[in-house]
Regions:
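Hydrophobic face of amphipathic alpha-helices that form TPR/SEL1-like repeat modules
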Residues: 1-32
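A short local loop/turn or secondary-structure capping micro-motif enriched for an aromatic residue
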Residues: 28, 44-47, 156
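Glycine-rich loop-to-alpha-helix module at the N-terminal edge of alpha/beta enzyme cores
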Residues: 34-123, 133
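Glycine-centered flexibility sites
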Residues: 15, 42, 96, 144-147, ...
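Conserved strand-loop elements at the edges of beta-sheets that form or border functional pockets
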Residues: 29, 41, 140
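Short glycine- and Lys/Arg-enriched binding-loop motifs that mark or flank ligand-binding interfaces
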Residues: 11, 92, 121, 140-143, ...
Length: 175
């Protein structure tokens, strides 16, 4: 069902899977009270490492040609679509939400990445504020690493609402 490493769900920091400095905790399904798996429990040191990794990656991501950044976001959307059923099943099991909601939420996650992929080119030009009678000048620049916190009720889809626009704008993300 849900794909995970033999050591449970780990943190991904600087492209590597790492255990949490705070040990781990069991994630329990509200559906049947079964243990789904062990999840890395992060601590302040883990957050600091993730923030430093995001800061180090920021210049490369920020300066990437928009065409390349858009292509990456579209590949993410395609990956979500390819695994939408698995994502929905995991979300049902993890949150207790009904299939009819989670199956749509998984697809919506892909749609969020596609939408923001289409916004990559306009992320810096300010042209969304066009007016026939006024001159609008907007300077948009990526601000750096963005910290994202996701609520528990629809975590996958709500994560995409936050991660996709940040990546499209040229920011890196700690989630």
């Amino acid at each position: 069902m849900c794909i995970r490493g033999s050591r449970g769900i780990l943190h991904r920091i600087a492209g590597k899977d790492v255990a949490g400095g705070g040990g781990s905790f069991a994630t329990i399904s509200p559906v049947d009270k079964s243990t789904i798996c062990e999840v890395a429990r992060g601590d302040a040191g883990d957050i600091d490492k993730a923030a430093k990794a995001a800061k180090a990656a920021f210049p490369t991501w920020r300066d990437m040609p928009t065409k390349e950044r858009k292509a990456i976001l579209i590949r993410i959307a395609e990956g979500i679509e390819a695994r939408a059923e698995e994502i929905a099943l995991c979300e049902c099991w993890d949150t207790g939400q009904a299939w009819r909601f989670m199956s749509k939420a998984a697809i919506r996650g892909a749609e969020n990445f596609r939408y923001f992929a289409d916004q990559v080119g306009a992320a810096r030009d300010g042209q969304h504020l066009q007016s026939p009678t006024l001159m609008n000048i907007t300077t948009r620049v990526p601000i750096g690493p963005v910290g994202v916190i996701t609520p528990w009720n629809t975590p996958f889809m709500l994560s995409t609402w936050k991660i996709a626009p940040a990546l499209a704008a040229g920011c890196t993300v700690v989630h």
